[in-house]
């Protein structure tokens, strides 16, 4: 693991992907379940102060998320634009806490993930790709129902920033490798939107290979590792009951 990059990040720091995921996790823990108003409040807090990130300011945020967060309120948290530019991969990068909190109920995980995605990304493609991603991540495998969604061109060295390309590219990195580490290295070394494709790949590969497959040398460098693990455990406990 190395630092640097366009934001000169230290080893183990996270970008907007991680910050928004932590903001969602905090809302679930505080409210003991899905609370879009609390998630909106946390997003706005992060946008203003950098809280939930690794610094006391926001050093990385996409235009779609930034515009939506500025527009959303706790009374109306669903502020995602609906134009063709609002089909970015930022809607997938932050969903791990929702799947942890609903690990016994895929339909609930899908519904809540779609809702949180629509808070910042309102394009019509978001719903089907979010449902596909959550379903296949929680099952730990590709399914024939979503085969067509993975046929987006992934041969280019750079990703496009769209949800379509990120979803296909992440699965490609998992399918063409045989370990968590190799999948992540393949994904992030494509460059361009490496943090987001890496985050999406990490969820898929994490489900496939398990926590024990994450290299210890990576975990040792992770900023606030103990706090993140504690949050993950609290989220997992929220999903103790099966679907009703």
For the regions a language model picked out, list residue spans one by one.
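Structured, active/binding-site neighborhoods that engage oxygen-rich ligands
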Residues: 1-244
